[in-house]
């Protein structure tokens, strides 16, 4: 795992994805829908506002915990200790993506976090056949 980005190896992601799909009593379809949406996004970059709209939620606050749940499940499965923010909240999303605040004038006035899917997670999704590999021209 890269200390700078918390990106894991392709094999670790594959193991974590299998764990997610085998886990009982969770909505596998929802979490795969989230990962597929992120994978298919331009530059594999999304905001939580975009994810919320895709999932049919009113705003980003409903999408945040679902996105974080994927990371928390990965962390639990692989025994990862996660960095925390200033409030002491674990940054589970960092196992899925790196984030930046981007001036997002086209979508929202002000600044919004943009999440870039980790390349190794993208590769793991492809290798497991969970997404169709993107074609490059």
Predicted regions and their residues:
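Short, Lys/Arg-enriched N-terminal segment that forms or immediately precedes the first helix
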Residues: 2, 6-24
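Short alpha-helical "packing" element that flanks the helix-turn-helix/winged-helix DNA-binding module
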Residues: 30-37
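Short helix-capping/hinge SLiMs at alpha-helix to coil transitions
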Residues: 39-43
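Short acidic, hydrophobic short linear motifs in intrinsically disordered regions
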Residues: 45-50
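Short, basic interhelical loop/turn and adjoining N-cap
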Residues: 56-62
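DNA major-groove recognition helices of helix-turn-helix
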Residues: 63-77
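Short Lys/Arg-enriched helix C-cap and helix-to-coil transition segments
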Residues: 76-89
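Phospho-regulated, low-complexity intrinsically disordered regions of nuclear gene-regulatory
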Residues: 87-137
């Amino acid at each position: 795992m890269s200390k700078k980005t918390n990106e894991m190896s392709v094999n670790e992601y594959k193991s974590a994805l299998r764990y997610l799909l085998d886990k009982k009593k969770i909505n596998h379809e929802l979490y795969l829908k989230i990962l597929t949406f992120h994978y298919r996004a331009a530059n594999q970059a999304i905001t939580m506002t975009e994810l919320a709209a895709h999932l049919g939620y009113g705003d980003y606050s409903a999408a945040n915990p679902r996105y974080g749940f994927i990371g928390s499940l990965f962390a639990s499965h692989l025994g990862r200790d996660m960095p925390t923010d200033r409030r002491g909240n674990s940054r589970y999303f960092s196992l899925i993506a790196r984030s930046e605040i981007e001036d997002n004038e086209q979508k929202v006035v002000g600044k919004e976090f943009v999440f870039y899917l980790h390349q190794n997670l993208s590769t793991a999704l492809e290798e497991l056949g969970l997404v169709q590999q993107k074609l490059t021209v």
